[in-house]
Each structure stands twice: as C-alpha cells, then as structure tokens.
Amino acid sequence: GIGKELIEYAINDSKEKGKSGICTLVSKKKKPFIGEKKFFEHYGFKAVDTIGDYELLALQFDDSETPRFNDNARTMKIDNQDFTIYYSNECPYVEYEVNELTEYAKENNIKINFIKIDSLEKAKNAPCIFNNWANFYKGKFISNTILNANSFEKLIK
C-alpha cells in the first residue's frame, strides 16, 4: 500500500542524501495520527527511547550517536497554567483551527495561548515530544489531538 511506498521512499531518499538514519514516534497504545510499531519494525526500526506510552524508533544507517528525546520534552509540562497549544503547519488544517479557536476564545473571554513551532530550534526545545500539535492545560500535557471550537469547549468544561 501507500505506507510501504512512503517508508521505502523515505529510507532510500535519506540514504541517497547521506543521512545517518530516520526516526519516528509510536505509541504502546493505539493513538490517532501515530504509526504502528510493528509496521516500522518490519523495516528494521528499533526502539531507542521512551517517554510514558510513547517510543522513539530509529533506523540507523551508520554508527552515529543514537537519537534520544530531549530532556525538556521528558516532563511534558509547562509553567503556564492557561490553555496553551504548541503547533506547526505540518497539517493543512492547523491554521484554520488556530483561527477558529482564537475567535472562539475572544467571543467567550477565554485565555488561550498559541505557540507556533516554525524552526528546528523551536522544535528541539518544545516542552513535549509532539511538535505538530500539543495541548497543555494547567501546566500539563493533555493531548496531541487537533482541536476545533466544539472539542475545545468540551475539554475546558
């Protein structure tokens, strides 16, 4: 299927470009938008680090340093107690949802913070393992599910 074509392309492309390997994130439990471990293991990926239910898998092409999660991602916490969303534009719907949530928060006088991850440095220093969308409330990571106004309202009530 398409997954096989994509992973084989990624592996070949990375090797052709002289990369050290490829990493991906999986979960011990089935979660939305996260690949299945068995699929990647079939291509030689191995677990190299863990945070809670999440595992970092790597397919290394050489003997370079084994990838690890950054220390700041291990806590999955932030100092801010307001609802805070870290996001990037990996998904084409993200900006739409950010705009919808911004409008909803204004209309309902709710404090919500958006922190856009738009550089490698910001991604490396993110307070969790997700850099495409991460929801924090009262300082704690609560999910990586992209929210719209309706799902946000259910979460905060």
Identify what each model region corresponds to.
Residues 1-14:
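Conserved acetyl-CoA-binding loop-helix of GNAT-fold acetyltransferases
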Residues 14-32:
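Conserved GNAT acetyl-CoA-binding A-motif
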Residues 25-26, 37, 41-58, 142:
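Conserved catalytic-core motifs of GNAT/GCN5-like acyltransferases
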Residues 52-74:
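C-terminal "cap" of GNAT-fold acetyltransferases
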Residues 73-107:
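Local sequence-structure signature of Cys/Sec-based thiol-disulfide redox active-site neighborhoods
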Residues 110-122:
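Thiol-based oxidoreductase modules, predominantly thioredoxin-like and allied folds used
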Residues 127-136:
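Structural micro-motif
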Residues 138-157:
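Non-catalytic, surface beta->alpha helical segment in thiol-disulfide oxidoreductase systems
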